[in-house]
A protein has these predicted regions:
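Active-site acidic short loop of glycosyltransferases
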Residues: 15-18, 145-147, 174
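Feature captures the FAD/FMN-dependent oxidoreductase FAD-binding
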Residues: 85-158
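A short, basic/flexible loop-to-alpha-helix module at the beginning of a structural domain
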Residues: 1-17
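Glycine-rich active-site loop/strand segments that organize a redox cofactor
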Residues: 52-100
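Short amphipathic alpha-helical segments
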Residues: 33-35, 59-60, 161-165
């Protein structure tokens, strides 16, 4: 995200400050939270998840036959090795692995569901991020500041598919 000096911390005392804000409660977000709370147990953090569940891709995609295309000994967590029967695991098993890991590590208590990031602006004078999120369940705007912002949001747009831009797209009829 571009650096700016035009977004100082809002003066409102009600703005929560976190040491770290993690975006996304999927495989990467849960893994990042584990490493953060292990290496920096003093750090305050939250995970903002736009959806209503832990698991990211593995929660969203539940079609028949969905599975990993990487072996779980590589894809899984080094701190909680995969013990499932299948090395190339099905989506439901991977989702359970992520959910169980979050619960066992106490990470689930840090997740704020229905929080979709709208903007993030770095303030050089304040040396912190100001992050604005929208509650997808209530429409409420939430503003927090943080020293570190970790994007673990994956690469899928859950709200719409990818639409490429190509010449004469408006004339394409199918």
């Amino acid at each position: 995200m571009p650096e700016t000096t035009t977004a100082p911390t809002p003066p409102d005392a009600a703005v929560e400050h976190l040491d770290v804000l993690i975006v996304g409660a999927g495989l990467s977000g849960v893994g990042a939270a584990h490493h953060l709370q292990t290496a920096c147990p003093w750090a305050s953090y939250a995970i903002f998840e736009s959806r209503a569940a832990i698991g990211g891709t593995w929660d969203l995609f539940r079609y028949p036959g969905v599975r990993s295309d990487s072996d779980m000994h590589t894809l899984g967590y080094g701190f909680r090795p995969w013990t499932g029967a299948k090395t190339i695991a099905d989506g439901a098993s991977i989702r359970s692995y992520i959910v169980d890991t979050a619960a066992e590590e106490g990470i689930d208590r840090h997740i704020r569901f229905h929080h979709r990031i709208v903007s993030a602006a770095w303030s050089t004078p304040d040396a912190r991020w100001t992050v604005t999120a929208e509650r997808t369940d209530t429409g409420e705007t939430v503003v927090v500041t943080c020293g570190f912002l970790l994007s673990c949001a994956g690469y899928y747009r859950y709200d719409r598919g990818y639409l490429p831009d190509f010449a004469d797209m408006d004339r394409f009829t199918g």
